[in-house]
C-alpha cells in the first residue's frame, strides 16, 4: 500500500541569476514548474507562508502532498530539468503522517 508523502519546502530566496531573468522568462520558468507539479501528481497541501519576519534564514515555506514516493521523485527530477535549482535556494524535508510512520 502506498503512503502519501509530504514535503516541507523551506525557501531561502532567489539567486542572482533569477533576478537577471526578464518577466517573460520568469513566467516561463514558473509555468514549467507548474506543469511538472501537475504531471507528478503533486498538489499544494498548504498556502505559502511568509516567515522572513521571524528568522534570518528563510523567506517563506509551504507543504506539498504526493500520492506516493515515486511522485515526489518525479517532481524533484522535473524541477531539476526545469532548472529551478539554478534560480531558487531551498531546503526540503520529506515525511509521512505519524499514524502512517513505521514503528520504531
Predicted regions and their residues:
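Short amphipathic alpha-helices in soluble, non-transmembrane regions
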Residues: 74-82
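Short S/T/G/P-rich N-terminal loop/turn motif that feeds into the first structured element of a domain
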Residues: 1-58, 66-74, 95-104
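Conserved, mostly hydrophobic/aromatic
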Residues: 62
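Conserved short beta-strand edge segments in small beta-sheet-based binding/regulatory domains
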Residues: 84-96
Amino acid at each position: 500500500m502506498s503512503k502519501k508523502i509530504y514535503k516541507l519546502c523551506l525557501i531561502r530566496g532567489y539567486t542572482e541569476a533569477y533576478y537577471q531573468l526578464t518577466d517573460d522568462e520568469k513566467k516561463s520558468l514558473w509555468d514549467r514548474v507548474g506543469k511538472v507539479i501537475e504531471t507528478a501528481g503533486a498538489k499544494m497541501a498548504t498556502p505559502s507562508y511568509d516567515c522572513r519576519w521571524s528568522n534570518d534564514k528563510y523567506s517563506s515555506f509551504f507543504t506539498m502532498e504526493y500520492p506516493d514516493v515515486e511522485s515526489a521523485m518525479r517532481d524533484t527530477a522535473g524541477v531539476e530539468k526545469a532548472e529551478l535549482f539554478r534560480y531558487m535556494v531551498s531546503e526540503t524535508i520529506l515525511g509521512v503522517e505519524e499514524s502512517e510512520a513505521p514503528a520504531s
